[in-house]
Amino acid sequence: MFKGSIVALITPMDIKGNICKKSLKKLVKYHIKNKTNAIISVGTTGESATLNKNEHTNVIMHTLEYADEKIPIIAGTGSNATSESILLTKKLELSGISGCLNITPYYNKPTQEGLYLHFKSISESTDLPQILYNVPHRTGCDLLPQTIAKLAKFKNIIGLKDASGDLSRVNQIKSLVNKNFILISGDDTTALDFIQLGGNGVISVTANIAARHISKICKLALAGNFYKARKINEKLKILHNLLFKETNPIPIKWAAKYIGLIETDKIRLPMTQLLDKNKKNLKKIINLLQLNKNKFL
């Protein structure tokens, strides 16, 4: 169902820190124009942790409105409280979203049995397609391949976003799940290798400002043309790394503002503005790639 370049969309804000609908609309149109395959609305990159419940829902609904059924919208509905995740999922059931991205519960560090029961409960509460999301370095818990295999038996748990950084897991998980289970990289720096090992695409931070590049890389890679895909990807390596010099989404919001996609790089505390030295380096690579001119290399 989902493959290729899926953007982990930033949530633009105005100078007062309120949601900027004008910039959000511009972002959505940018991804439609540049052939992004789907949008993640209000995931980690979308600052889900610092949006209140009404804002969370409103951003998703506005994203759907601006997408106008021209691009699938996947809603970030994860929580470290199972009941909260179920509540948000059910609230969005008739909204028109194409699926949900569910992060592993953060901070409370559940056991593998707890993780299994958490995702099982969410799955059984809805018919919406569910994508599991494993990002151990941010959550403090790791969804292991054996647990993923158990969860893959639920018909609406259709895939996994793997941001573990462990490429050896791709084949391990593939050997444990059915052939239709989707494996999506959550790490721009290793995404091409992930696809070459049998993955289906990437949920990308870099795509926020280099949508056509990431789309082309994924299209080539999924067609088996890794030589051409690597030629493009090599040009983005420095950019990938610079976008994670500080905690995501600090650098990507500044970069999106720099190239004119959003009006401000406002970000909510406890996240802070990008350091000047990192702005300088990002500006240099953005100019080199001509992303500020919206050109495709």
Swiss-Prot record:
It is an enzyme of class 4 (lyase). It comes from the Bacteria. The keyword Nucleotidyltransferase does not apply. This is 4-hydroxy-tetrahydrodipicolinate synthase. GO terms for cellular component: cytosol. Homotetramer; dimer of dimers. GO terms for biological process: diaminopimelate biosynthetic process; lysine biosynthetic process via diaminopimelate. Pfam families: DHDPS. The gene is dapA. Pyruvate binds at T45, I203. Pathway: Amino-acid biosynthesis; L-lysine biosynthesis via DAP pathway; (S)-tetrahydrodipicolinate from L-aspartate: step 3/4. The record marks T44, Y107 as: Part of a proton relay during catalysis. Keywords: Amino-acid biosynthesis, Cytoplasm, Diaminopimelate biosynthesis, Lyase, Lysine biosynthesis, Schiff base. Belongs to the DapA family. Catalyzes the condensation of (S)-aspartate-beta-semialdehyde [(S)-ASA] and pyruvate to 4-hydroxy-tetrahydrodipicolinate (HTPA). Its EC number is 4.3.3.7. InterPro entries: Aldolase_TIM, DapA, DapA-like, Schiff_base-form_aldolases_AS, Schiff_base-form_aldolases_CS. PANTHER family: 4-HYDROXY-2-OXOGLUTARATE ALDOLASE, MITOCHONDRIAL, DIHYDRODIPICOLINATE SYNTHASE. It comes from Buchnera aphidicola subsp. Cinara cedri (strain Cc). The active site is at Y133 (proton donor/acceptor), K161 (schiff-base intermediate with substrate).
